[in-house]
């Protein structure tokens, strides 16, 4: 299938409010911990950061269903629509669009869980609360992005990316 061609990035770097966040999952954890121990300067080509302090927060209880809905804010736009889903989305009315986006978000979370080696027995519930149902265009690929928040019964690490464009910083969540 379409999703089988992609691997979820195990190391993600986000720059939010002039802070750098490095997220490592599974085999991406140890390299990040090693890196933070000897990090003085980060050079991204167009911007260089001098590193004065690092904090490491490790959690083992992520990527699992929970018995309640957790609220997550989208710190960066969630790129929910690609060319294929975008053309389907455009012909829907607003009520259908909300259901469609809830299903896409659920699929994003299920994909993530499978990538982490988790076989879900429970249903994943999602409820989007977006600032607009009109997607913001993302680059020349005709992708569509949304801002706002969502609720789900799945525990996600802060600053992790969901949706399309993760390697470019899209879809960062905070709950």
Regions picked out by a protein language model, each given a short descriptive name:
Residues 1-175:
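RNA-interacting cores
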